[in-house]
């Protein structure tokens, strides 16, 4: 039995009931239902707690494998298999990561629309992030232009919609892959699509806010020339 991904069903879930399927010091804890985002696509995993029988087990990370393994803090007790637990995410961290991830999609959409550049890499932490683009040249006022355009899109309060499509159908959507290399594994038959309506549509597995107005404001903190025609844009969400 695999973990049911509540984070994919509804990214606003912060607390839920679950049953422990397995637990070991070597592998971690596997639940039948979990809202912990396991990490991937540049988005770090969630953190939080499991509450059971008056005990509190802190979850500080995840490990990928055949199952979604939750990693407890060192020294915290493990709930035995079969234990009913109450899961709770670190709400501040998750919400910040959702805002940041959606902000990166706005940035990606603006740079692709205005400059035709594809993404070559990226990473994020709560409220800060960087994204690399395949760009040989940029205008002198590029940094200000990008920030202004991103915040204009945020102010439009565009809806952010999530859907799934069969792989063959998804890849018929123009420019559905915004990275220079297709990062969707070949074994993935159902592709998750994140659509900032009217701006950016791409394959993505992360968690997002419901509209661009919920992101806040994007500040372009730094523009770096990484050589070989790559430009790195660093942002902060405020």
Which residues are covered by each model-predicted region?
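Active-/binding-site microenvironments in catalytic and ligand-binding cores
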Residues: 1-238
């Amino acid at each position: 039995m695999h973990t049911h991904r509540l984070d994919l069903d509804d990214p606003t879930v912060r607390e839920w009931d679950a049953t422990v399927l397995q637990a070991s010091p070597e592998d971690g804890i596997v639940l039948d239902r979990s809202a912990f985002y396991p990490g991937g696509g540049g988005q770090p995993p969630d953190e939080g707690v499991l509450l059971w029988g008056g005990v509190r087990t802190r979850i500080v990370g995840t490990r990928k494998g055949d199952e979604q393994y939750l990693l407890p803090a060192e020294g915290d007790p493990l709930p035995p298999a079969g234990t009913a637990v109450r899961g709770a995410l670190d709400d501040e961290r998750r919400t910040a990561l959702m805002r940041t991830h959606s902000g990166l999609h706005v940035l990606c959409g603006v740079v692709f629309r205005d400059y035709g550049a594809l993404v070559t890499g990226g990473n994020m932490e709560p409220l800060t992030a960087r994204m690399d683009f395949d760009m040989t040249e940029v205008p002198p006022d590029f940094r200000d232009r990008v920030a202004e355009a991103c915040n204009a899109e945020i102010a439009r309060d565009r809806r952010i919609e999530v859907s799934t499509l069969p792989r063959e159908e998804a890849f018929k959507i123009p420019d559905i892959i915004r990275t220079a290399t297709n990062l969707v594994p070949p074994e993935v038959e159902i592709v998750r699509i994140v659509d900032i309506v009217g701006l950016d549509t791409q394959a993505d597995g992360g968690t997002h806010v419901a509209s661009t107005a919920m992101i806040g404001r994007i500040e372009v903190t730094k523009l770096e020339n990484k050589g070989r025609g790559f430009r790195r844009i660093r942002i902060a969400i405020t």
